[in-house]
């Protein structure tokens, strides 16, 4: 679909995510929950956070895709969104369908239905960074319309998460995933 992506080396538990979070002023209590492994979840959030910082520093619009993001349709070249927009089809649980084609308020869930594919502008990245200093948590849940009422999503979703493994969730966190089955790996 003509999307050329760069590669970002993720923050992993081996890189001491608690120290990195402390250096950025990010509280860690929101990452201690029943669905994910603490250090892995924190590391994933910090990877996204680092890209938000780069977005602000570069003063450029960014598209962030996780390893399991698969493009199934074209993303419009000029997408008229405000600050942050999800491109990803919900990857777990039930979801609502947006009411119109194109850019919509975040409708499928109250939070991003997975953080596997989204775009953001420097102004949106700045707001995410600032809010993370108060109540950070798992990336998709952090991107919640109660925190950021301006979040949007594009429909029909041009990106799907086609995951066969997780390095973040515990078994309980995988049960609602659309691709979860007997062969799904928790690494």
What are these regions (language model features)?
Residues 1-65, 69-187:
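An acidic/histidine-cluster motif and surrounding catalytic segment
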């Amino acid at each position: 679909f003509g999307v050329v992506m760069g590669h970002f080396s993720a923050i992993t538990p081996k890189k001491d995510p608690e120290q990195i979070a402390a250096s950025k002023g990010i509280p860690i209590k929101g990452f201690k929950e029943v669905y994910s492994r603490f250090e892995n979840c924190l590391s994933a959030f910090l990877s996204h956070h680092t890209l938000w910082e780069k977005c602000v520093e570069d003063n450029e619009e960014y598209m962030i895709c996780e390893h399991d993001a698969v493009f199934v349709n074209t993303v419009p070249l000029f997408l008229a969104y405000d600050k942050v927009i999800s491109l990803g089809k919900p990857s777990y649980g039930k979801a609502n369908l947006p009411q119109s084609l194109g850019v919509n308020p975040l409708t499928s869930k109250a939070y991003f239905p997975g953080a596997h594919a989204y775009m953001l502008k420097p102004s949106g990245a700045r707001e995410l960074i600032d809010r993370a200093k108060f109540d950070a948590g798992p990336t998709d849940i952090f991107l919640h319309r109660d925190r950021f009422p301006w979040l949007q999503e594009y429909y029909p979703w041009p990106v799907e998460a086609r995951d066969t493994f997780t390095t973040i969730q515990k078994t309980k966190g995988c049960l609602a995933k659309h691709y979860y089955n007997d062969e799904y790996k928790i690494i």
